[in-house]
């Protein structure tokens, strides 16, 4: 990575505007999953230990440019204080007189959490005036919010035009891991692409077909490929307008010498619920009024063998409706195979796949779990991320 990192600056006595991703799930004012807060700790601790005055900025939810009381960041400051072992003050502004006063009262090594940046209408519009207002609070900008790096917003991209900047440790790690995987992968290199819709994964499949040795398909999007091969899919998810594209992808795989794996058997149900009637059928035998909600046992065995023989695996999207216990088996099989494969470097592309390995208690067995669903997806599509492009070059 040719962007400046934390080691390129002397932070002693400097005020740092550090963009983090504290967009955490909350219930009744309590944080239900603090993975993203934990992920930002190394950068926050380093800046504080180096004697910087640390201003943390993040979004939370979608307040659409106005103040929403339930989306204030105060509960995050409380939890952060416990994790850092020192008081983190929450300010009810992200810029302005109150924020300025709080910044001026901060000691070297002190940490301050600014208010939700999306309370300001200019944030998502990348308004230069708002970006300048953020920049006026600090000497250096650090972006550690990989989860928001694909957004060109005032606190992720705009501010970088007005301050010297650097990637934080988390941002650096994400870019290194994903960058290495896509530019210089260990082989065999396998991509596992699941999830509901083909349309969400078009760019990823297209880009990865130029790079991988094996492509494994699962989840709802698989049935458009199954149908494209001439099988009936009953009431399974199907995108009629993507059938030609599915055929093109399968042809491209053949031309590129990529092995293309699709379900050979599935678990079908007569209703989308945990207590529906369900049965295992071959891919050629999906009944007209039933829908496929998971990959079957034969498919799982095939996929497991491919994964265990791979040196690098990128996984994005579940194999079935893992939120329902009855249809979690396929996703669990992939997660278990990666957990057991000691010679395989596994990269979990955020979002649902990350939630699944977390749910199965296998998160610590994965080599790298990306903190950015949308950002890692766009990176895997080969797109440049605005929040990264804007950072200072070495």
UniProtKB/Swiss-Prot annotation:
Name the top EC class.
transferase
Cellular component (GO) terms are: cytosol
| Phosphothreonine PTM sites in chain numbering | 299
Molecular function GO terms recorded: ADP binding; ATP binding; phosphoglycerate kinase activity
Which pathway does the record list?
Carbohydrate degradation; glycolysis; pyruvate from D-glyceraldehyde 3-phosphate: step 2/5
The entry marks the following residues as binding ATP, namely: 201, 323, 350-353
Which of the residues bear the PTM Phosphoserine? Answer: 183
Reaction equation(s) it catalyzes:
(2R)-3-phosphoglycerate + ATP = (2R)-3-phospho-glyceroyl phosphate + ADP
Q: Can the keyword Phosphoprotein be found in this entry's annotation?
A: yes
A Gene Ontology biological process term: glycolytic process
Query: Gene3D superfamilies in the record, alphabetically?
Result: Phosphoglycerate kinase, N-terminal domain
CDD domains, A to Z: Phosphoglycerate_kinase
Q: What is its EC number?
A: 2.7.2.3
Q: What InterPro entries does its record include?
A: Phosphoglycerate_kinase (IPR001576), Phosphoglycerate_kinase_CS (IPR015911), Phosphoglycerate_kinase_N (IPR015824), Phosphoglycerate_kinase_sf (IPR036043)
Instruction: Give binding positions for substrate.
Output: 21-23, 36, 59-62, 118, 151
Keyword set includes Signal: no
Q: Where in the cell is it found?
A: Cytoplasm
**Keywords associated with the record:** ATP-binding, Cytoplasm, Glycolysis, Kinase, Nucleotide-binding, Phosphoprotein, Transferase
Family listed: Belongs to the phosphoglycerate kinase family.
Q: Which PANTHER family match?
A: PHOSPHOGLYCERATE KINASE, PHOSPHOGLYCERATE KINASE 1, CHLOROPLASTIC-RELATED
Q: How is this protein organized at the quaternary level?
A: Monomer.
Q: What is this protein called?
A: Phosphoglycerate kinase
Gene name, per UniProt, is pgk
